[in-house]
A protein has these predicted regions:
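Surface-exposed acidic, glycine-flexible loop patches that form ligand/cofactor-binding
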Residues: 42-44, 107
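Conserved phosphate/anionic-ligand binding catalytic regions in large, soluble enzymes, centered on
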Residues: 13-31
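Terminal domain-start leader segments
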Residues: 2, 39-41
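C-terminal regulatory domains involved in ligand/effector binding and gene-expression control
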Residues: 74, 79-191
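Short glycine/serine- and small hydrophobic-enriched flexible loop segments
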Residues: 29-39
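Generic hydrophobic, aliphatic-rich segments that mediate packing or membrane embedding
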Residues: 30, 67-68, 130
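A structural-propensity feature for long, helix-poor, extended segments
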Residues: 45-84, 88, 92-95
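Short, hydrophobic/aliphatic alpha-helical segments
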Residues: 2-16, 52-53
Length: 191
């Protein structure tokens, strides 16, 4: 069975914080997703510390592509498409000077960047070259949750081990395509 994913032009061309959809938008979405997962599992208020580990190309180019900043902002619950750009620098200064961040903007935890945000430049996770691992600990440093995410391009992320679920579209897309050539052919035919 072939599962097709419907994409809009708005999925392909996005407004969001940069400079990179794979190295900035994706990691911010992954960090926010992990914080939301903690909340969904009822673990947010028991979380005393979170660590984020970057692998592969995220680790190699992370600081230059603002991946470190994206992780901090995502853990705070910010989203690349709705973030107030004027809030970025004050939030980062607060986190870095206090060595604390607010998970989802409301649960304050310790976060010492050199200890809690690690760049593994010589390692790659098995699922993709843009891999991240997030771990939440309680006050006794017991692991509450650990998840791996992959930034697969365009700001899209997948969580390792999460099964892909086919979503039934409410309506058939007007122009299905499997390649760039087919997309261009639809464009030419429609004018």
């Amino acid at each position: 069975m072939v599962v097709r994913m419907s994409l809009s032009v708005f999925d392909i061309f996005k407004i969001g914080i940069g400079p990179s959809s794979s190295h900035t938008m994706g990691p911010m979405n992954a960090a926010r997703s992990f914080a939301e997962l903690l909340e969904t599992r009822g673990l947010l208020t028991n979380t005393a510390q979170v660590s984020a580990q970057l692998y592969g190309s995220l680790a190699l180019t992370g600081r230059g592509h603002c991946t470190d900043r994206a992780i901090l902002l995502g853990l705070e619950g910010m989203s690349p498409d709705t973030i107030d750009s004027a809030a970025v620098e004050p939030a980062l200064q607060r986190i870095r000077s206090a060595k604390r961040l607010r998970l989802l903007g409301r649960h304050e935890i310790d976060f010492d960047e050199p200890l809690n945000l690690l760049f593994h430049t010589d390692q790659v996770l098995p699922g993709h070259s843009n891999g991240m691992r997030f771990t939440a600990h309680d006050a006794a440093l017991n692991v509450l949750a650990r998840e791996e995410y992959y930034s697969i391009g365009g700001g899209f992320v997948i969580r390792a081990g999460a099964e892909a679920h086919a979503v039934t579209a409410r309506h058939q897309p007007p122009f299905e395509f499997d390649s760039g050539a087919q997309l261009l052919a639809h464009g030419r035919a429609q004018g």
